[in-house]
Every structure is written in structure tokens, then in C-alpha cells.
A protein has these predicted regions:
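N-terminal type II signal-anchor transmembrane helix
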Residues: 1-36
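General helical structural elements
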Residues: 7-8, 68, 187
């Protein structure tokens, strides 16, 4: 019985390690995608993240907004759609992202907001009605998050062409990065089971 328990634990840990390695590989692949002769998109959808982290502005959210704003300023996105709901402290992700983008030089009239979503599935589903006039879309998020976001987008936006753009590093420590990858594994399991 004890031997079977140990073997089960080893198999579980090996599977978990393999899943972490796969997510890290996808993240590296997303970060290194070539951007030679990029085609402009109609809009970039920037996926939300909590506004504050440990009482301070979240650098990971800012990194996503910076990536979206850069796409707009470079003429690679005709506008931005900020997608994110209200955090536990009452901060709304989409509104905070819009304000950040405006401070980075993106005109307010080039920014749409989807302020209700509380998950990646909802980011994609709730953004769909706001994308009725867009055919070419760039999804912006952390590199490790993009594979799942793309999987969901292809199911909810079948008539759209979706490309991916990884935001820059937000200074995560290795333990924090591994925690995020572990959380992403659980999110993939939920997505696979529920298609959400």
C-alpha cells in the first residue's frame, strides 16, 4: 500500500513537472515569435489581470497595457479592447487599463472596454460582441497565458483571424513564475473539462 502511494506520488509529480515544462516551452515560443513584416490588425484585445498586487499597482497588468499601447503606436493595431472585471478591492481592470493606455498616448476614442469578465473564458466570450467590426485581432497577455487564450478565442471567434503578442516580463521571481504556471495548469484542466 505504501509503495503504491509513493509510486502514485512520483507519477503525479512527474506529470506536473512535464506540464510545467510544456507551459514554459509555449511561453518561450510565444515570446520569440518573429514579427518581421507584421500585418496591422483591426484591434488588439488586452486581457486583464488584477489592478493591484500586495497594495501596489500590478506590474504585470502594466506590462500587458504597455504591449497593447506599443502595438497601437506602431500602427500594428487600429485600436485596443481592454477586457477585465472588478477585483476584490473594487478596482475595475478594464477601466484601469484604459486609463493607463491613455497615459501612454493612446486616444480614448480608440479604446473599447469590456468591464465584466472574471476569467479568461469570460474575457473571450464577453469581448465577442465588441469585436463585430474586427476581422484581424491580436491577443495580448503574458506569454504563458496565450496558448489557452488562443484556444478559447478560436472557439468563440471562429470567423476572426487571431494572432498572439506576448507582453514583456513583469519582474516575477522564479517561485512566483512557477506558481503562475501551476495555476495555469489548473486553468487548462478546467478549460479542457468544461470548454471554458
Amino acid at each position: 500500500m505504501k509503495r503504491r502511494l509513493i509510486l502514485s506520488a512520483i507519477v503525479f509529480l512527474a506529470g506536473w513537472a512535464a506540464a510545467l515544462a510544456q507551459l514554459h516551452f509555449w511561453a518561450l515560443k510565444a515570446e520569440s515569435r518573429p514579427s518581421e513584416n507584421p500585418t496591422p490588425a483591426d484591434i488588439a484585445v488586452v486581457l486583464g489581470n488584477s489592478v493591484n498586487r500586495k497594495g501596489a499597482p500590478n506590474p504585470c497588468l502594466r506590462s500587458r497595457v504597455e504591449a497593447g499601447a506599443a502595438l497601437y503606436r506602431q500602427g500594428l493595431a487600429g485600436g485596443l479592447l481592454m477586457s477585465g472585471g472588478t477585483d476584490g478591492d473594487g478596482s475595475n481592470e478594464a477601466e484601469a487599463m484604459r486609463d493607463m493606455a491613455v497615459s501612454m498616448g493612446v486616444p480614448a476614442d480608440k479604446i473599447r472596454i469590456e468591464p465584466r469578465s472574471e476569467s479568461t473564458y469570460e474575457n473571450i466570450a464577453f469581448s465577442a460582441p465588441l469585436l463585430h467590426d474586427a476581422e484581424q485581432i491580436i491577443l495580448v497577455s503574458d506569454a504563458f497565458h496565450l496558448a489557452r487564450a488562443e484556444w478559447l478565442a478560436k472557439r468563440h471567434w471562429p470567423d476572426k483571424t487571431v494572432r498572439l503578442h506576448a507582453s514583456g516580463s513583469c519582474g516575477d521571481s522564479t517561485p512566483n513564475y512557477l506558481r503562475k504556471l501551476s495555476r495555469e495548469i489548473l486553468a487548462w484542466l478546467k478549460t479542457a473539462a468544461l470548454h471554458r
